[in-house]
Curated annotation (Swiss-Prot):
Component of the eukaryotic translation initiation factor 3 (eIF-3) complex, which is involved in protein synthesis of a specialized repertoire of mRNAs and, together with other initiation factors, stimulates binding of mRNA and methionyl-tRNAi to the 40S ribosome. The eIF-3 complex specifically targets and initiates translation of a subset of mRNAs involved in cell proliferation. SMART domains: PINT. Belongs to the eIF-3 subunit C family. The gene is NIP1. InterPro entries: EIF3C, EIF3C_N_dom, PCI_dom, WH-like_DNA-bd_sf, WH_DNA-bd_sf. Residues 831-847 have a biased composition (Low complexity). It comes from Coccidioides immitis (strain RS). This is Eukaryotic translation initiation factor 3 subunit C. It is found in: Cytoplasm.
């Protein structure tokens, strides 16, 4: 036992030391690229800890001697340090050898896997320098081998197995696409393979003493005191030059959509590339990629909308892109163009020719618009931040108009369906920022936009001088979209024009356009956002009719939206979450995305007030009319108003009105009682009328409507008690002119609402007796109606409970027939034993059944 611990100078000690060195060397070879690129201090400390961990047994007690031996060896030993590039080249060569070995045995599954690995490895190398020539050799030889295999497959009868065939097809497709990027280099290699490979510079191996590695960082810091430089992976300084712009952009584009992509770092790189860009083509390509990356940054954020800072940067870059395209018309950004593949040189554009660059400025401005709306949706509308953010709409509108001028010019040069579609899309975006605004606001918006645009720019669709006439501007845009677009864009343009006309008190034009468009019939075929716009337009027409004093039209138009009780949802102004709703989280998310910003909302309290007021003017006279005409009892114009009125009447104590709804109901009760003055005072005291344009005019219209409907209510209520009634008396009661009262009474007589005649000689109304029912007769008719309703309900209940027992209660009295209950044996008897009166059978209907399971069982 003692020899194991104290035999320190034996051969076994030296052999174990050799083994430890062998293991440590093997561990160093297996270190990854990332660990190799750490600082020299960390590496030296790790090696020392590894050596210490390797001391076992007696070594741990003889540590001083071991350290002494190692220190002596370190003085004489040197370490070969390989750069990250050399290691990656070695990995590349290893992958190429695996591909060559797989080619010998025709293993295409391995070739496919290793080819993908080869491309990933070379992508890291290209980031720091040129493409390795050994990679060009590998892909050129692989393409030749693929072509040879294709020829062999045509001549041989032996087929590949499934995995081999799948790998071969994959490589055949990818090698062709991959080699397009290196066509020039592959041609050079195939012309003279030996000379091509000899031209490659040999990488020097840096040999340093191990102790010198500890001062590498200090030396680097001392040398870099003069300035800063960007350092990439492996400590290599990244240089941004005009020649490397396209390569950097290709790497960034290829990394889009991949996980763990640092988009902020990519944006910084492209901002530096933009500073060194030396040609318009470089600027255009960088801006196209940079704007797309900014929008990708917003997509991946947790807030689900673009920050104000990033939005303004994107807006500025879009403006710069449009300016560059306007200054250099030889470059055209269009969808569907072929991408320039050669990253080594710039495309040469001959005079008079046009180079098409793939991209879409229309999509950029649409996305910018969507991000602003999404941002406004998430900001509290009652804060100063919302007002400040809303001010950015001017910047957005400037870009929309400028992009419109650009695509409009392209469409004039070369007319095509995609370019016409781009014009339609931008025009629609412009219209959607105008249709809901008053003319004064639109005029300010247009003036500021044309001031910011260069003087040389103008539009053939909406010229610069059209900014002063807002109605003509909206009509021109809509007419253009009617002519050159179809489907959703055309329908939305029509709805926007109708909304604009209704907003500016042109009711009859808006109504006629809505009727002629036939959108009411097929609106269900459109998408949800268009249906929301339809609901908003319908509501705006109703509000316009109310402002014009057309009460019946207003109530009829608003009833579809307001009568449902779901105004918030139908107008996209809020979500009503029910306790037991079956809405999935995805559907709820979509609903929230469809919500309109607060500045586009229609005041729901004002909308409800107008709907209830219109219903009051129609329902109160109708209730007075049906009190003497029971056949009209079931006629209800507004169930919502009736329900609120009934609820209020059931209250034991009713205080003064506390809100808009209570004010309208209280006014309706005064009107029904014949006190039109109190009704007018109560209705005009509602403060929400001050939110409308020209509130004094609205209140005067309401007072006149209350006087007229009060007159109608009075005549319906007290007509049975009069023989004649003086028009002068009515004029004094309701503060209306005799001419107006005569007109109202004439209209009631012509519509057969009032059984009377107008005596113009005596200036009186003569009522006809015997037409209207008395109170007793009305009660009798009401009782008869209720009895019939009760009888029908009882019969329906009996049918439901005895369904399927038709023949069990059959009243047929044919001879020999097996009749119902009590007629099983002999004789013809009716139910209960009484013979039928007068030989008449029971009238059809009711309980005469014809079949069923129980009836069949009784027959048997």
């Amino acid at each position: 036992m003692s020899s194991r611990f104290f035999h320190g100078g034996s051969d076994s000690e030296s052999s174990s030391s050799d083994e430890e060195e062998l293991y440590s060397d093997r561990d160093e070879e297996e270190v990854s690229d990332e660990e190799e690129e750490t600082t020299s201090e960390e590496e030296s400390s790790e090696e020392e800890s590894d050596d210490e961990a390797g001391l076992t047994g007696a070594k741990q007690y003889l540590r001083g001697a071991a350290d002494l031996d190692e220190s002596d060896e370190e003085e004489d030993r040197v370490t070969i340090v390989k750069s990250a590039k050399d290691k990656r080249l070695e990995e590349l060569e290893g992958t190429m050898k695996l591909i060559e070995n797989a080619e010998k045995i025709n293993d295409w599954a391995v070739i496919s896997t290793e080819f993908d690995k080869l491309n990933r490895q070379v992508a890291k190398i290209i980031q720091a320098g040129p493409t390795p020539k050994i990679y060009i050799k590998a892909i050129a030889d692989l393409e030749d081998f693929v072509n040879e295999t294709v020829v062999k497959q045509k001549t041989t009868t032996k087929k590949m197995n499934a995995s081999n065939a799948k790998g071969f097809n994959t490589v055949k497709q990818r090698i062709k696409k991959n080699n397009k990027d290196y066509t020039a280099e592959i041609e050079k290699y195939r012309e003279n393979k030996d000379e091509y490979l000899e031209e490659e510079e040999e990488q020097e191996t840096v040999i340093v003493e191990k102790k010198a590695r500890t001062i590498r960082i200090e030396d680097t810091l001392a040398q870099s005191d003069e300035g800063f430089s960007t350092v990439g992976r492996g400590g290599r300084t990244l240089q941004y030059t005009p020649e490397s712009i396209l390569k950097h952009l290709r790497v960034i584009v290829e990394s889009r959509g991949k996980k763990n992509t640092d988009r902020i770092e990519q944006i910084k790189v492209m901002e530096k590339l933009l500073e060194v860009a030396s040609s318009p083509y470089h600027t255009i390509r960088i801006l196209l990629t940079l704007i797309s990356t900014r929008f990708d940054l917003a997509t991946s954020s947790l807030s689900n909308y673009m920050s104000t800072e990033q939005w303004k940067l994107a807006e500025n870059e879009i403006s710069t892109l449009i300016s560059t395209l306007e200054e250099h018309p030889q470059f055209v950004v269009t969808e569907g163009a072929e991408e320039w593949e050669d990253d080594e040189k710039l495309p040469q554009v001959a005079p008079g020719e046009v180079l098409k660059v793939p991209g879409s400025v229309v999509s950029f401005v649409e996305r910018l618009d969507d991000e602003l709306i999404r941002s406004l949706q998430h900001i509290d509308p009652h804060t100063a931040e919302y007002i400040e953010r809303l001010g950015d709409e001017q910047l957005l509108y400037n870009n929309i108009v400028r992009v419109l001028l650009y695509v409009e010019g392209l469409n004039q040069v070369e007319k095509s369906e995609p370019r016409q579609d781009s014009v339609n899309r931008v025009l629609m975006r412009r219209l959607e920022h105008l249709y809901f605004k008053p003319s004064q606001v639109v005029t300010i918006l247009e003036d500021n936009t044309w001031k910011d645009l260069p003087e040389k720019l103008s539009s053939s669709i909406t010229p610069r001088d059209m900014k002063s006439d807002v109605s003509l501007l909206v009509q021109t845009i809509c007419n253009y979209l009617f002519q050159y677009s179809d489907g959703i864009i055309r329908a939305r343009a029509m709805l926007c024009q109708i909304y604009f006309l209704a907003l500016h008190d042109k009711y009859h034009r808006a109504r006629d356009l809505m009727l002629m468009s036939h959108l009411t019939e097929n609106i269900s075929n459109f998408d949800v956002s268009t249906q929301i716009l339809f609901n908003r337009t319908l509501v705006q027409i109703g509000l316009c009719a109310f402002r014009a004093g057309l009460i019946y039209e207003a109530q009829n138009t608003l009833s579809e939206v307001c009568g449902s009780g779901r105004q918030k949802e139908l107008l996209a102004q809020g979500i009503i979450l029910q306790r037991y709703s079956s809405v999935s989280p995805e559907q709820e998310k979509l609903e929230r995305q469809r919500q309109l910003p607060f500045h586009m909302h229609i005041n729901l309290e004002l909308l409800e007030c107008i709907y209830l007021t219109s219903s009051m003017f129609l329902e109160v006279p109708l209730m007075a009319q049906t009190s003497s005409s029971p056949e009209m009892k079931r006629r209800i114009i507004s169930k919502t108003f009736r329900r609120m009125l009934d609820y209020n009447e059931r209250q034991v104590f009713t205080g003064p009105p506390e809100n808009t709804r209570d004010g309208v109901i209280m006014s309706a009760k005064f009107l029904a009682a014949g006190d039109w003055k109190k009704a007018s005072e109560t209705l005009n005291s509602i403060k929400i009328w001050d939110l409308m344009a020209q509130p004094d005019k609205i209140k005067a219209m309401l007072a006149q409507q209350i006087q007229e409907e009060g007159l109608r209510t009075y005549l319906f209520t007290y007509a049975p008690f009069y023989d004649t009634l003086s028009i002068t008396t009515l004029s004094n009661m309701f503060d209306l002119t005799e001419k107006k009262i005569s007109a109202i009474i004439s209209r009631m007589i012509s519509h057969e609402e009032l059984a009377a005649a107008l005596d113009q000689v005596n200036n009186a109304i003569v009522f006809r007796k015997g037409v209207e029912l008395s109170r007793l007769q009305s009660q009798i008719v009401t009782l008869a109606d209720k009895s019939m309703s009760l009888l029908e309900a009882n019969e329906k209940t009996l049918e439901q409970r005895t369904q399927g027992m038709a023949n069990a209660f059959q009243r047929d009295q044919g001879p020999g027939g097996r009749l119902g209950r009590g007629q099983g044996r002999g004789g013809q008897r009716t139910a209960g034993g009484r013979p039928p009166i007068g030989g008449q059978q029971r009238r059809p209907g009711g309980q005469q059944f014809s079949g069923g399971a129980l009836g069949g069982a009784i027959k048997a």
